[in-house]
Amino acid sequence: GLDCPTGRALAAGPLKLTTDAEARTPSGTLSLTDINERTLKSLDVKFGLGTFTAITGVSGSGKSTLLYTLANSLRERVKTSVDDGDVASKSKGPAEKTGSARATTVELSADLNSDIAINRLVQISQKPIGRTPRSCLATYTGLFDRVRKLFAQTDEAKRRGWTVSRFSYNVTQGRCPTCSGEGQIEVELVFLPGSYTPCPDCHGARYNSETLEVTWNGRTIADVLELTVAEAREVFADEEAIARALRALSAVGLDYLRLGQPATELSGGEAQRIKLATELQRAQRGHTVYLMDEPTTGLHPADVDLLMTELQRLVNNGNTVVVVEHDMRVAAQADRVLEMGPGAGARGGQVVADGSPATVAQTDTATGRVLAERSSS
């Protein structure tokens, strides 16, 4: 076979399934009792803290509803809830619309040690990181604040009396007046959604010409926004805070994105991985529950492996990860597979298989059959 990512993926051997013996032992239990949401009827489900759970099942079987219900129930009980909806639309998930979510009770089991109380809930969805070009990779991850500091510390910036705000494309002094720092101009089209075209004055640089007279190591701040993550890792190798953020982006397979890539040009999967990387660079030990809906959508198998490495690292640090997933490469590596079904809609909403991937592979269910088939060569 060809030695390239796709060639290696096609030639990859059978999936290795986590066995009962290999699965992590939960450090505590999270119980959801009597869930009545959409297709879920009087359902009781337990999740193991400090483990990796993959919720699988056919489309419409209730996977996402279960995840939303877990999120809503936890949200009322944790100190910090990071729901990425704050930057995107305020539209509510299915479980939040129905109103009966309040009936769902979450009990932290008695064997939950006080030192692993959950104090953070992080929901990572595929909502955009912003709706206009004003939000970009560098601003969302926070690394741009540190880059601006470097520019403000240059002799030339000090000589001119400029502070970090001069190097923000959201501030009048530094930004291009024509596009107001967006680097693009929205074109209104009759009967069609508007689209963006590069600014005729700054040509996408976002800044006015005076701001671009200041350089750091021979680069303007607009040059920095043009760097890809991979290029920026070399440029900022000695700046630990920036390098750490870049390493996290690289770890989820985003080496190819430009630092200034506008939110409007990012796919849902890319947005989700940017959020994950932003979390990874500040991941504390334990105490956090991460919920993700289809994190591998649109990913190449090589990127799925990168993502799995990072998710496993979160769990190794004592955190809890629950994902809804169609990708069997993810399910195979989970500690536990929770399969919803047996069908969709009214014919779904039940747990039809539950156990380590190796155990589920022995059941005659949709996920079980695929795991069995993919794990035997």
Regions found by a protein language model. Name each.
Residues G1-S377:
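Conserved phosphate-binding elements of NTP-dependent enzyme cores
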